[in-house]
């Protein structure tokens, strides 16, 4: 599927989610030989048996390599930065002893732009579409002339070839033919399209090229499927815009140059943090696929993937968490993300739940106990990386109460204080935050039907937010706010210590009647994962309590390919007592391996110094490792992308991975690995090196950018300890070590191009 700006408003190509086959329609290249043999380098849709086939996903591109009867094709798809076009780079090799004459057909089915409108009324709006061939641009043009309030923004689609186009079709039904589908289009079988433009119906782009690949030789061409804007429904303006936008795109060397731009972008993004560790699978995940996944999630929030249809917009808490992982690689991007999120906060301190910056619809108001609590950790992460405390005084308007526009102006710091006030004004009978609609666990709101339920998870979040803000206040001399934060934190910690500890683990909360949730006597869901990890993230409780909670997790929730969200799952649907109705046992929030929540357990174990357990939890969820353990046919998700959850025990689909790419797992797995397992992270007082390693690792290396300095960090572990730094130096000069951590002051890096750091771990 391809879209411009919004997959809801400006969807360019069709994708039929949930239908079989699940990956259709796609971007198809048909290769036809003179004898009528037809095949595709992507295998689908033709499904002709190939002599050789491979697919390789790389950062920013996908490469298919296939061979049939002496013709080898390398097909690369990518979108260059700064270009609103999907490039199809086609390279052909001929290993036969004679020249090969081939017909190539590039095909994509177009959408009607507005996906929801297409579902509701596409049988009318199909009369408002037009396709035609623009010979000057050597491109097929697709124009939607359905008038809308944002008509001027609607793009014009073009589909061009770098080679002469011998025939074309802009009409799907004409290209495919009656009673057929994409595996055998009548135009491909006939060896020619009908040069059919579209005045009404179902649009597509189909371009036909005739090529001759010499014996032992090569041939190369490319296609671009892209958009131009500002055409205002005019055919003349559309043609002018397409000709101008594509002037350089047809040149033979253009794909190479644009691919270099793409590679440079990813190289710069990766260079912010790279590691060398003894585990090659973990190293590849940390160095390559974690940052790729975090970019995807930060760009698209939870709105769109092969299952999500694009209607969810931008989740507030989702994007706030995604931006924490972006902050140390691209702080400017994270700052812009935070500014937008603050514009979606109400003056009372709470926030919207979902917003739609590109979809021309109002934000979705839904009072939850956690959304606003993700702001403080994001701000803290940005300040730790940039030390730009001037951000605190920037003014950003609140959102109007009816979500229709801007409210009163406030500084970033005032936004943070408003978030604290909202939680302080919404505490329950035990002094814990009221659950409201829900907290991070959406279904926990079912324990709160009358509005009197309380959440321990949000209580721990509140403590962490207060600690982060207190640190910032201390650094910036805001003494009155510091005193207030400390008072709020002390009260919340006291409430948690008095009412959240169940004897062997931390409770999940309280229902409307004041009954504990996540207690040893609960009906289902006796033990929840999140309170155990977040007690440690927030620094609440004694060491004995923290260890006990995580030991309970290891004993009851670890199933070898992840930690279940709770145990035992709720099992019935016929009474209010079975609160998590809807999800079957082992699914979603009812006992699945919720990978996002696993990340906090990894951080918790690393904080406690349990390196063996922390790395076990990390490595057992790496997609490649899950596939090796369970099998690809069971897991059914990509080997290069984190998933949201994996179906747990008690369900016949146990091991099935769900919701890949657009998940909070990506950001937090990246944070867990780089900042807590490898232990190199920015804090307000400098760069910390605080690794937590497996005992068999004797040395690792981390290369990181900090305050404009390229830092090379050698971490030695000659005694095979899990945690604890005993010696450190920067540029050959000793640095003090405190409580097993090496803290390198910001002054060491400012104005320095490169700095080498050495850290030695040992027994404290």
Locate the predicted segments by residue.
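Low-complexity, Ser/Thr/Pro/Gly-enriched N-terminal "stalk/linker" regions
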Residues: 257-309, 336, 340, 422, ...
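Catalytic cores of carbohydrate-active enzymes
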Residues: 105-107, 118, 352-353, 461-578, ...
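Aromatic-rich carbohydrate-recognition surfaces in CAZymes
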Residues: 314, 318-319, 323-431, 455-463, ...
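An extended acidic
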Residues: 1-67, 143-189, 258-278, 668, ...
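Short Pro-Gly-centered flexible turn/kink motifs
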Residues: 100, 211-229, 462-465, 755-757
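Polysaccharide-binding surfaces and accessory modules of carbohydrate-active proteins
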Residues: 64, 78-186, 237-267, 271-272, ...
């Amino acid at each position: 599927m391809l879209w411009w700006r919004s997959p809801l408003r400006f969807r360019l190509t069709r994708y039929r989610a949930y239908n079989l086959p699940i990956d259709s329609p796609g971007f198809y290249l048909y290769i036809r030989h003179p004898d009528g043999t037809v095949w595709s380098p992507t295998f689908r849709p033709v499904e002709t048996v190939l002599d050789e086939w491979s697919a390789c996903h790389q950062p920013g591109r996908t490469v298919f390599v296939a061979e049939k009867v002496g013709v080898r094709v390398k097909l690369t798809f990518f979108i260059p930065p700064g270009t609103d076009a999907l490039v199809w780079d086609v390279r052909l090799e001929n290993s036969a002893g004679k020249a090969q004459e081939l017909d190539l057909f590039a095909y994509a089915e177009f959408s009607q732009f507005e996906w929801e409108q297409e579902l509701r009324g596409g049988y009318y709006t199909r009369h408002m579409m037009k396709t035609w061939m623009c010979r000057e641009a050597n491109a097929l043009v697709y124009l939607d002339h359905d008038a809308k309030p944002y008509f001027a923004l609607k793009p014009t689609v073009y589909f061009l070839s770098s080679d002469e186009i011998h025939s074309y079709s802009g009409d799907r039904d004409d290209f495919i033919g009656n009673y057929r589908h994409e595996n055998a289009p009548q135009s491909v079988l006939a060896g020619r399209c009908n040069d059919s433009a579209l005045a009404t119906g179902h649009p597509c782009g189909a371009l036909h090229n005739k090529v001759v690949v010499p014996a032992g030789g090569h041939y190369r061409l490319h296609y671009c499927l892209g958009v131009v804007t500002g055409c205002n429904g005019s055919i003349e303006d559309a043609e002018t815009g397409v000709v101008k936008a594509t002037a350089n795109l047809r040149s033979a060397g253009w794909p190479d140059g644009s691919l270099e731009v793409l590679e440079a972008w990813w190289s710069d993004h990766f260079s912010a943090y790279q590691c060398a560790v003894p585990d090659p699978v973990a190293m590849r995940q940390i160095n390559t696929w974690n940052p790729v996944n975090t970019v995807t999630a930060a760009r698209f929030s939870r709105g769109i993937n092969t299952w999500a249809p694009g209607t969810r917009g931008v989740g507030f808490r989702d994007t706030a968490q995604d931006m924490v992982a972006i902050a140390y690689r691209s702080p400017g991007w994270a700052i812009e993300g935070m500014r937008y999120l603050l514009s979606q906060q109400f003056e009372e301190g709470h926030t919207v739940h979902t917003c739609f910056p590109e979809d021309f619809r109002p934000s979705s108001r839904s009072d939850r106990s956690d959304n606003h609590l993700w702001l403080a950790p994001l701000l803290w992460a940005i300040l730790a990386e940039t030390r730009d405390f001037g951000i605190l005084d920037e003014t950003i308007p609140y959102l109007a109460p009816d979500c229709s526009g801007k409210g009163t102006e406030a500084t970033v710091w005032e936004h943070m204080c408003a978030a604290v006030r909202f939680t302080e004004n919404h505490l329950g009978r035990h002094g814990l935050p009221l659950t409201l609609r829900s907290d991070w666990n959406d279904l926990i709101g079912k324990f709160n039907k009358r509005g009197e339920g309380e959440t321990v998870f949000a209580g721990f979040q509140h403590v962490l937010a207060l600690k982060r803000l207190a640190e910032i206040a201390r650094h910036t001399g805001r003494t009155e706010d510091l005193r207030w934060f400390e008072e709020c934190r002390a009260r919340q910690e006291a409430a948690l210590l008095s009412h959240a500890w169940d004897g062997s683990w931390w409770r999940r909360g309280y229902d409307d009647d004041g009954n504990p949730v996540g207690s040893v006597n609960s009906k289902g869901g006796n033990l929840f994962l999140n309170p155990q990890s977040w007690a440690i993230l927030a620094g609440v409780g004694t060491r004995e309590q923290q260890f006990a909670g995580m030991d309970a997790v290891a004993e009851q929730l670890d199933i070898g390919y992840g930690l279940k969200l709770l145990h035992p799952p709720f099992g019935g649907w016929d009474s209010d007592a079975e609160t998590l109705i809807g999800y079957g046992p082992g699914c979603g929030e009812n006992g699945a391996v919720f990978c996002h929540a696993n990340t906090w357990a990894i951080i918790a174990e690393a904080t406690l110094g349990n390196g063996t357990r922390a790395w076990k939890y990390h490595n057992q969820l790496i997609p490649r490792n899950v596939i090796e353990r369970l099998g690809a046919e069971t897991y059914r998700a990509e080997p290069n992308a984190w998933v949201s959850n994996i179906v747990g025990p008690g369900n016949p689909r146990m091991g099935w991975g769900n919701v890949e790419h657009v998940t909070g797992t990506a950001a937090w797995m990246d944070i867990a690995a780089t900042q807590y397992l490898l232990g190199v992270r920015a804090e307000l007082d400098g760069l910390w090196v605080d690794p937590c390693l497996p005992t068999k690792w004797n040395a690792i290396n981390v290369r990181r950018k900090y305050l404009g300095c390229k830092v090379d960090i050698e971490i030695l572990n000659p005694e095979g300890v899990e945690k604890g730094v005993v010696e450190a130096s920067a540029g050959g000069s000793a640095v003090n070590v405190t409580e097993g951590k090496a803290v390198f002051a910001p002054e060491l890096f400012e104005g320095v191009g490169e700095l080498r750091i050495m850290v030695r771990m040992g027994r404290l």
